[in-house]
Amino acid sequence: ITDLDRYLFGKYRGKKIIDINTPLNYKSFVFSNTIIKRNILDDAGTFDENMSNYGGEDTEISIRISKKYSQGIRKLITAEAYHITQKTINQYIENMFEYGKYNFYKIIDKHPSYKNDLGYLWINSIKGNMLFNTFSRFMCKTLMKLSHHPLLIKFLVIDAFIRGAKNKF
């Protein structure tokens, strides 16, 4: 297991233990390990092909599925999934920059009521600028030389997303 795997599938990214009878909300979908019935995709639609850059296509389809099946999407106890991450931490961080730059606003345009829930308020807010800036990024990268703690990775991932969103198009 890599440091990136520990971040992606650990508690600091928001890993939740979900009861079998609890409906999944759109934030709980991780499409690299998800099985969706064909009739649900036929009804909600497939991935948005206008999202040609990295990221957000899974979030966008999750929103559509959650809107149509708010009580119907459940965890399948018998399904087993194994996921091997092929990326480095730096590659993933670069992917999140690309997501913020190219696809985040496409999701917001299609689903404006979700913008605050998706982190829009952090992009140009005072609190976002105070927390995510050149100095804090430098400090975090310096600390990463000592430890690849998942919270440091999380900070750099969010920072990359915000920088990408500020540099859209």
Predicted regions located by residue number:
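A recurrent flexible, glycine/aromatic-enriched loop bordering the glycosyltransferase active site
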Residues: 17-39, 52-54
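Catalytic beta-strand/loop signature of glycosyltransferases that borders the donor
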Residues: 72-82
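Short, well-ordered alpha-helical scaffold segment located
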Residues: 39-43, 80
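Conserved donor NDP-sugar-binding/catalytic core segment of glycosyltransferases
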Residues: 1-6, 70-72
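Non-catalytic, C-terminal membrane-associated alpha-helical segments of glycosyltransferases
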Residues: 98-99, 116-169
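Acidic donor-binding loop at a coil-to-helix junction in glycosyltransferase catalytic cores
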Residues: 53-61
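Nucleotide-sugar-dependent glycosyltransferase catalytic core
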Residues: 53-54, 82-106
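Hydrophobic residues within well-ordered alpha-helices
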Residues: 65-66
